[in-house]
């Protein structure tokens, strides 16, 4: 048995907030009360000065397994997630082979059983991620796919997107879309703006995101499908999402910590480690993302954890792959750049990391209740620390936040009643 003592519990679903002790027996929380007695055989976790939250849920990660395990694999990705306070992670399908078939999905599902946390998987929307023919969504759902996404590539065929949405609504599964029209991306990973001009590039225009966001928002309105616009980066895209919500669309937008924390200027400091798709944009876009998190236009914080090797990121900017790791810094960036700034409360932040992503993916997770699974993170919101490359649990270290001082440190992560990470 484990008892968490003296912590400040915040659970957005039950609206419990205050000092409570939590008793865990086996896989489940068995008691939540003020001042539970301690027996000799109970392991005690002292959570003084810490917030006790439901374990975080990431709906957008890349564990690169199968096919690219020199970058990351399911085991190391799960280890990184546990260090970041995540107890459930949903992985994207752009592996090798892509997850458009039951055989590849079963490999991932079986390997995930040995991971430190819960690792779930989406299937692709189209076969081979080619944007031409839909996968057998029903068969993939039956085999364990929790949703569908061609993340990493846009789907340019509007009729195919509508058919996918209609099928997804029938099956009650969510779809997630990467919105970048390649005709408006001259060089990927850098905003079409002043920084690109300094580097003699044209970059990825904001319109690359907004035109596809507008199309898919309109299709979400007409189809009723559960739709996620991934890693939103543009102020204009946010206005489109807001309008679609007002028109009754079952649509959400996710924001990544990088898009609400830094701007295109970071490329001048960090080079390829700040290269992401869609790119970091202007300060007014960053502020708009923060405002949208505040007014709930954006309901989910997702990491888009995208590990790459040092050799890959050492290439010239145009040749280097896009993406940065994010699971181990997401909480700290949210605390530092959303809560400490006064834009979000801790409850608001935790909602976007727990119950909101759980609801979107139809998961019975994201809360702390007696008689239910003990997925819990304990973090010190006021502990300040420096991000160090050598402390990453991921195989990769492609992060622009190395060397930055951040608030909010995970102290303990508990998954399924077991301690899977402790800050030593």
Curated annotation (Swiss-Prot):
Annotated residues for binding of Zn(2+) 1: 60, 62, 151, 304
One GO CC term, this protein: cytoplasm
GO molecular function: allantoinase activity; dihydroorotase activity; zinc ion binding
Known pathway: Pyrimidine metabolism; UMP biosynthesis via de novo pathway; (S)-dihydroorotate from bicarbonate: step 3/3
Cofactor: Zn(2+)
One Pfam family this sequence matches: Amidohydro_1
Record: active site: 304
Superkingdom of origin organism: Bacteria
Residues involved in Zn(2+) 2 binding: 151, 178, 231
Binding site for substrate: 62-64, 94, 277, 308
Enzyme Commission (EC) number: 3.5.2.3
Keyword field: Hydrolase, Metal-binding, Pyrimidine biosynthesis, Zinc
Gene Ontology biological-process entries: 'de novo' UMP biosynthetic process; purine nucleobase catabolic process
Top enzyme category: hydrolase
Catalytic activity: (S)-dihydroorotate + H2O = N-carbamoyl-L-aspartate + H(+)
Cofactor binding summary note: Binds 2 Zn(2+) ions per subunit.
SUPFAM superfamilies in the record: Composite domain of metallo-dependent hydrolases, Metallo-dependent hydrolases
Cited InterPro entries: Amidohydro-rel, DHOase, DHOase/Allantoinase_Hydrolase, Dihydroorotase_CS, Metal-dep_hydrolase_composite, Metal_Hydrolase
HAMAP family listed in its UniProt record: PyrC_classI_B
Record family assignment: Belongs to the metallo-dependent hydrolases superfamily. DHOase family. Class I DHOase subfamily.
Function summary: Catalyzes the reversible cyclization of carbamoyl aspartate to dihydroorotate.
Identification of the protein by name: Dihydroorotase
Native source organism of the sequence: Clostridium acetobutylicum (strain ATCC 824 / DSM 792 / JCM 1419 / IAM 19013 / LMG 5710 / NBRC 13948 / NRRL B-527 / VKM B-1787 / 2291 / W)
């Amino acid at each position: 048995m484990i008892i968490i003592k003296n912590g400040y519990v915040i659970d957005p679903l039950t609206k419990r907030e205050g000092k409570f002790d939590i008793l865990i027996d086996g896989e489940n929380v068995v008691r939540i009360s003020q001042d539970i007695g301690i027996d000799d055989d109970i392991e005690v976790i002292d959570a003084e000065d810490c917030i006790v939250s439901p374990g975080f849920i990431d709906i957008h990660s890349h564990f690169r397994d199968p096919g690219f395990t020199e970058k990351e694999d399911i085991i190391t990705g799960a280890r990184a997630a546990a260090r970041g306070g995540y107890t459930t992670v949903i992985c994207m399908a752009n592996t090798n082979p892509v997850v458009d078939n039951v055989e590849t999905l079963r490999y991932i599902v079986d390997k995930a059983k040995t991971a430190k946390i819960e690792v779930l998987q989406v299937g692709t929307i189209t076969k081979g991620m080619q944007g031409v023919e839909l996968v057998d969504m029903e068969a993939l759902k039956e085999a364990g796919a929790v949703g569908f996404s061609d993340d990493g590539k846009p789907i340019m065929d509007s009729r195919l997107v509508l058919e996918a949405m209609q099928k997804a609504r029938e099956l009650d599964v969510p779809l997630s879309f990467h919105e970048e029209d390649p005709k408006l991306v001259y060089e990927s990973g850098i905003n079409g703006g002043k920084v690109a001009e300094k580097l003699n590039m044209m970059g990825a225009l904001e319109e690359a995101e907004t035109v596809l966001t507008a199309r898919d928002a309109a299709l979400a309105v007409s189809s009723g499908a559960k739709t996620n616009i991934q890693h939103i980066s543009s102020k204009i895209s946010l206005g489109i999402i807001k309008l679609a919500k007002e028109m009754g669309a079952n649509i959400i937008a996710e924001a990544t910590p990088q898009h609400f924390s830094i701007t295109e200027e970071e490329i001048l400091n960090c080079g390829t480690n700040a290269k992401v798709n869609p790119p970091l944009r202007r300060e007014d876009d960053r502020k708009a993302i923060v405002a949208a998190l505040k007014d709930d236009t954006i309901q989910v914080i997702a990491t888009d954890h995208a590990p790459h090797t040092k050799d890959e990121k050492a290439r010239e900017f145009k040749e280097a792959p896009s993406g940065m790791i994010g699971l181990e810094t997401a909480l700290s960036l949210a605390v530092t750049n959303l809560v400490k700034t006064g834009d979000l409360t801790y409850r608001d932040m935790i909602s976007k990391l727990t119950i909101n992503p759980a609801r979107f993916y139809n998961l019975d997770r994201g809360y702390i209740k007696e008689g239910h699974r003990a997925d819990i993170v304990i973090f010190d919101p006021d502990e300040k620390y420096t991000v160090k490359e050598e402390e990453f649990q991921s195989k990769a270290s492609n992060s622009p936040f190395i060397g930055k001082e951040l608030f909010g440190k995970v102290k303990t992560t508990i998954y399924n009643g077991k301690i899977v990470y402790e800050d030593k």
